[in-house]
Amino acid sequence: MASDEDSDEDFVTYGTPLEPLEEDEPSRKPIPVHEQTVKDEKGRYKRFHGAFTGGFSAGYFNTVGSKEGWTPSTFVSSRQQKSEKHNARPEDFMDEEDFGEHGIAPREITTTDEFASERKDQIKDKARAVSSLAALIPGDPGLLEEFIAPARSSIGVELLRKMGWKDGQGVGPRLKRKPRKQNTGRVYGCSLPRNGSEESEEDDDEFAPENVTFAPKDVVPVDFTPKVDSHGLGYRGLNPLQALGGGSGSGHINLFTLQSDRTTNLFGDRASGQERRGGIAGQAFGVGAMEEEDGDIYHKDSMSNYDNVLGGEEPGDGLYGWTAPQQYTKKKNALKRVMAYSGRILDGFALASEVTEIKTVYPPPDLPRDFRPVHYFRPVIDPSTVSPIVAQALQLSRGQLSQDASQQGRHKLDSTQRRDMLGESALQGPSSVFELLESKDRERLTEIRKAAESQKPSESNLSSAVDRAVVVASAKAKAAALQALSSRFQSSSTQPQPPSETQMALNAWSGPTADASKTFKPFSKNPQKQARYDLYISKLKQGDKDAVELSLDSSMTEWERGREREEFVRAALLYKPSSSSLSSRFTHGKHEEDTDTVDVAQEQENDVDDKQAAVKMKMFGKLTRDTFEWHPDKLLCKRFNIPDPYPGSSMVGMPKVKRDKYSVFNFLTIPDGSQVNPSDPKPSSSTIPRVTAEASSKKSRWDVPVQASEPKDAVSAFLSETRSEVSATQQTEAEVKTQTDALPASATSEVKVAQSVEKQSDQKNEEEEEEEEEEVRPSMDLFKAIFASSSDEKSSSSSEDEAEEEEELAPPTSEAAQSTTTSGTVIPPIPAQFTPAPDINKAMDLKHLTVQSVPSAETTAQSTQSSLNAPAKSQGLDEEEFGPRLPPPGFVPSTHSPQMKKQKKKDKEKHKGKKHKKEKKKKKSKKHKHKGKQKKRHEESDSSSDDTDSNSEDVDRDVPTSELLQRLKNLKNKR
Amino acid sequence: MAFPQPRPQAPQLPQHLWRTVDCQQGAVRAVRFNADGNYLLTCGSDKSLKLWSVSRGTLLKTYSGHGYEVLDADGSYDNSQLCSCSSDKTVILWDVASGQVTRKLRGHAGKVNCVQFNEEATVMLSGSIDGTVRCWDTRSRRMEPIQILDESQDGISSLKVSEHELLTGSVDGRVRRYDLRMGQLQVDYIGSPITCVCFSRDGQCTLSSSLDSTVRLLDKSTGEMLGEYSGHVNKGYKLDCCLTDKDTHVLSCSEDGHVYYWDLVEGSLTLKLPVGKAVVQSLSFHPTEPRLLTSMEGRVQVWGAEPEDAAENES
């Protein structure tokens, strides 16, 4: 049966179920006897003491002494504190498990007297019976008591009375008169002849009024008294009092309880008006000697006497003896005529008593054809803050607009024009959108102006420059308007969304890196929300600027929308494509035990920032210390010869609490108002959420004490269209093009990918990507090229040794790198070698490339940002290790060679060399070449002289696969 | 007291080189005295663990069975068992006399940095780069750890066990003290990745060295800093630190080839013992006498308070 599976869960089970047997599983070792332990529900071991000496719980869980049991209580009584009289109850001497489900005094939740039904209390009855023996009036114990005791009705009855119920009525909604039943009663077995009362009901129909309702009939609840005797069904046996004393007038002894409790309960209404024929009657018994009639002896039973439908119709006519006046019936008939309905009425449906009014629906107003649901504010730019070209361009465009503004109505006018037309005075607040802009954006605009000024384009160029500026400015203004819009729509309860975040999300997703199918689904719990999020992501990918607004559900309240907007943007940032490429490496677990919750340590550590501050001030102690509850394993305590600090607790480790697993708010912290301050003069602090700040601090202790996390260049974090259009084109692109002409097209496209990734990389991303590097490690070649080039172009000697190493590892590529590194470009040129498949249109290749370029972009970004960070960073890249490293193994005596010593020295020098600052780049590269060759020779000699040397781990790490192959070949040749 | 305290002797610092042992096992990742200080254990990067006599400098036994370089070792109190851990993610319990592997315990997800017996050698505790400390039962044949302490957010670099406490230093910059008797975990934030932790001999203080080239002495009960010792170089490598046998001085390895001695109370640099040119990777102080072991690259040096001849004459 299908329902079996469902009902399985409803069963109460005891014990542990056997694990399902799997066929292909290797047969497990049986658990040895000494490991088969019995534990109670708290995980305490149970020892069996014998059934008559305490069972499992002799003493206080197999120990002497207990909380209360064995320690003598002290009697203290003073003047101030009188000792209370302590009545020992039996419960005081019971164990915990005695109160359990199977104990001798099980504790269960019971209803209090007040709420209890009037069911008889068996215990009380017994008590009463006992006390009755000693009562004043023998035989009737509670008689006096019941006289005195106040009448008390249960709370249910009280409630019912309040609701209008009266004694004797049934419970339920009041009924209209029911259509008459055909068969008022069922008879099982012996049927009794009908009485007159039932026949009289037949013509009740016309008296039933329409608008009078009746309380339902009272139904005595079914009392399932168990059958304890061995008589047949319904047979009561002789009541000696009745039989001998002649209690009943009829002189007839009724052995059958046809009107017993059972039947009355079930068919109470049927029998109510009936006077039953007494005596033994029925087929099986024939006609008694005292009966007058003997007609129906050979009664034939027919199937119509049996009920073959479970449940069935409710007996009763619903009239309750009330005779309706004549006019009611007439009215009813009239109504019936009005509502005459030609069709058949389906079962379970009834004709409506009233005709519903048809509501008139007004169509929505027609929208004008050029109506757009989003309003863009027209920029009002102060000519003093913008370059003359931009201002000029704007004026030009506005001039055009204002010309036809008069014809097109007020929507085409901007606020100042309208103000002028109305003759109002200027508002006190910020007069231009520019003041609403963030300082960064303003800076950027000034940058544009500077760039434009420095260029001083010729007259012929001017027009194109103006065009471009117009485009840029309008895009700028659009963005600003959007920001203003979004901030306006957000209610005051939510923080204004830092506009940079939407921008960042856009940047993160709009690139070709986004892979639709493999994105993480943060709202998979809520499919609708997830659908909305998916829409948002897909819009992001298309580069839609107001993706959030469009993807939100318009039917939601404003507050909800604001909330969801924030969530989406953050989720988009968090689960951006680079991390999805990571997640694509893993498959989801087939079997999740509990998807809703995750264990989280109950006590959380204090703020790390505070601690860092304390450490800086050398104020160790309370500030830097956290104390947690920690539960050692029982066995561990035993092995350490230490009493269990938490006896009776089966927990191990830190106390855990369940938390929701996939709520975004577990991972995100809503930025504080203090942190997100749009008017913050500092460029970076206002835009980086708190999470990232923490993350960066975590990162800093990664391997080497990195310098305190410097504020990163904000420009790289937010890349607006302005930058890509103006600065990129004007400054870098030209240079890049002139110098990297030799590179194949694929390389440049990859550079672009790298750039786009770089754009989005704020500190948080870096950390994630750093972790990712451990997993998705690109080929060594890529690192080499980047380091070789970036270190050179920065011309900082700090990364000298890395470059050295890399060059020594790959002499062929170093030259390629050199040729390209003479430039001072921001974008690292990547040698052609690294684009194995020139066909970039293939999706696979593209993906491959993007994966590779993630770390590279990151490292380059770092190297360009802070030369100080570079050594630490690249060290981390070189090392696969976490935490403090192991010193180099030095040299094994067997491979003692002067050359090696030399290398050692150089190593030292390298360490010192970190402190040097700048050096000439060309000189260095020459040196590198030289060194590289030398070292390569060393290594080769090393590997040839000592093949079995296994401690060259450090060396091995840095060796590219190509060289490893070469070495292997050498080995083979020797053999 | 009826008798005045005997005048404390001037602390003797091991500064005379007694002998150098070339271990022939690659880089010596760790050098450890045994429980009574008569023998020493060297963990080689060639996957072998070696047992030496301190007084004669002779090799007694080589224990091979690890799959990668051995990173730490410890001897039981009764010298009957050894434990060692390795980059191959295993912890091995050895029988000293036979040199056989008694138990090879797998479970760590990364290389195992440190291992210790508890006082009665009933439990081995191993800390790994995977951020967990695992407590292995040596008594039963269970291959699963008794308990896994996964509170650390980063790799465990060092670990020490006292009678009822467990001290771990982690790369997440925290020193954790698990007090079994109290059922408490106390976390002290240092900030910089911890390379080594020690208890003081009196058990009241903890010593921790971190990658900011600082050794700190913290009060065990309150977490307050009692002393800060710096001057040495410890920026990238996992180096050891320790206290002398009488808690008078603090010792630390350094990347500049010296062992630094600081006065515990004053915090001043007492001695800068030149060991060699490379990094002094590991050191171990004799449990009762002023003797020191240092390891640099493939060699182990034994240092005494006075020249060896004088010491031998005395004894």
Curated annotation (Swiss-Prot), chain B:
Primary location: cytoplasm
Residue windows of the WD repeats: 23-62, 65-104, 107-146, 151-188, 189-228, 233-272, 275-313
Example of a GO cellular component annotation carried by this entry: catalytic step 2 spliceosome
Subcellular location: Cytoplasm
Record keywords: Cytoplasm, Repeat, WD repeat
Pfam families for this protein: WD40 (PF00400)
Annotated SMART domains: WD40
GO biological process, one term: mRNA splicing, via spliceosome
InterPro entries: G-protein_beta_WD-40_rep, WD40/YVTN_repeat-like_dom_sf, WD40_repeat_CS, WD40_repeat_dom_sf, WD40_rpt, WD_repeat_MORG1
Gene3D superfamilies hit by this protein: YVTN repeat-like/Quinoprotein amine dehydrogenase
Similarity remark: Belongs to the WD repeat MORG1 family.
Stated role: Molecular scaffold protein for various multimeric protein complexes. Acts as a module in the assembly of a multicomponent scaffold for the ERK pathway, linking ERK responses to specific agonists. Also involved in response to hypoxia by acting as a negative regulator of HIF1A/HIF-1-alpha.
Stated name of the protein: WD repeat domain-containing protein 83
